[in-house]
Structures are given as structure tokens and as C-alpha cells.
Amino acid sequence: MSSTAAKKDVKSSAVPVTAVVEKKEFEEEEFEEFPVQEWAERAEGEEDDVNVWEDNWDDETHESEFSKQLKEELRKSGHQVA
């Protein structure tokens, strides 16, 4: 095999440079950058007991319209409802 034939094989199997650059640009655009969030430092003695949701689950009405309809349908179909 001559040296020009070997060069042709190398050139034909090489990935075009533009394809590599385009791929890199796509990968960089794939992820969205988010700004850094600054959190306030806690003061000494600040309580760790922070309530982030309501603890009064028992205060909710257990006899909502939905639960009444569900119990009625269960009774109609022969199920025992407490």
C-alpha cells in the first residue's frame, strides 16, 4: 500500500472537526445554569425546631362530601363500612 493510499484511509475514517465542535456546543447548551442561592446564616441560639407544615391533621373534617359518597357507594355494593 502506498503512502497516499494510507493517507486517504486516515482522512476518510477521521471525524470532521466541525462535527466535534457542534457536538460540544450542544452538550454545553444541554444543561441550564442556575444562579447561586445565598442563604442567611443562622444566629447563635436560634432554634432548630422549625415547623414547615401543619401538625393539625386531626383537625380536618373526616366527614367530607367525598367520604360520605364513598361510604354510601360501599354500603350499596354490600361492603361493611365502619
UniProtKB/Swiss-Prot annotation:
Pfam families, alphabetically? DSS1_SEM1
Q: Locations of Basic and acidic residues compositional bias?
A: 63-76
Annotated tissue distribution: Expressed in intestinal epithelium and head neurons.
In this entry, which stretches build a coiled coil? none
Localization, UniProt: Nucleus; Cytoplasm
**Phenotype of gene-disrupted mutants:** Embryonic lethality, growth defects, larval arrest, reduced lifespan, and sterility.
What keywords would UniProt list here?
Cytoplasm, Developmental protein, Nucleus, Proteasome
* Gene Ontology terms: biological process: double-strand break repair via homologous recombination; embryo development ending in birth or egg hatching; epithelium development; intestinal absorption; mRNA export from nucleus; nematode larval development; oogenesis; positive regulation of growth
Where are the annotated segments for Disordered?
56-82
Q: What does this protein do?
A: Subunit of the 26S proteasome which plays a role in ubiquitin-dependent proteolysis. Has an essential role in oogenesis and larval growth. Required for intestinal function and default lifespan.
Protein family according to the UniProt entry: Belongs to the DSS1/SEM1 family.
Its name, as the record gives it, is Probable 26S proteasome complex subunit dss-1
Source organism (scientific name): Caenorhabditis elegans
What is this organism's lineage? Eukaryota, Metazoa, Ecdysozoa, Nematoda, Chromadorea
